[in-house]
């Protein structure tokens, strides 16, 4: 039995890319990279980073810390977070804990005392400084919705 394959593949040849790529290499200008406080991952336009790990390993915490730090360091950056497991409020609770130095449980259960006031105020002010450039995707969690949200 012979199979006939048809393809609708879209591609570009190396020849077609070479001249523009060579000029780009020779200009010596590197890509735009948004700074944050961790050595990895690199956050830049068109750069996709895939992070994997066991449940509870800290993937969400790491990514949110990178996103928040990049937002804090680049006033023109906007971020869209798509998380199917945690609510926006829970994600912000975690960042408030990290930024304020308060225990996550204290924030989660809202068990504040007078001794928490200064750190809570400082953490909230930090979150408020970038929250207007942070958005959370709502279902459906598909690429079409991501694209529409990015254009909004």
Task: State the predicted function of each range.
Residues 35-40, 69, 73-152:
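Cytosolic-facing regulatory segments adjacent to core modules
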Residues 2-102:
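The Walker A/P-loop phosphate-binding site
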Residues 1-2, 146:
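Generic low-polarity alpha-helical segments
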């Amino acid at each position: 039995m012979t199979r006939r394959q048809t393809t609708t593949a879209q591609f570009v040849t190396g020849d077609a890319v070479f001249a523009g790529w060579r000029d780009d290499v020779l200009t010596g200008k590197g890509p735009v990279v948004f700074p944050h406080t961790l050595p990895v991952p690199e956050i830049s336009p068109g750069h996709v980073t895939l992070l994997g790990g066991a449940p509870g390993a800290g993937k969400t915490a790491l990514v949110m810390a990178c996103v928040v730090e990049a937002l804090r360091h680049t006033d023109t950056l906007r971020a869209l977070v798509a998380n199917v497991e945690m609510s926006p409020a829970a994600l912000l609770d975690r960042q408030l804990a990290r930024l304020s130095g308060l225990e996550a449980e204290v924030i989660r259960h809202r068990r504040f005392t007078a001794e928490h006031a200064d750190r809570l105020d400082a953490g909230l002010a930090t979150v408020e400084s970038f929250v207007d450039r942070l958005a959370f995707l709502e279902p459906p969690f598909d690429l079409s919705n991501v694209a529409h949200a990015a254009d909004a």
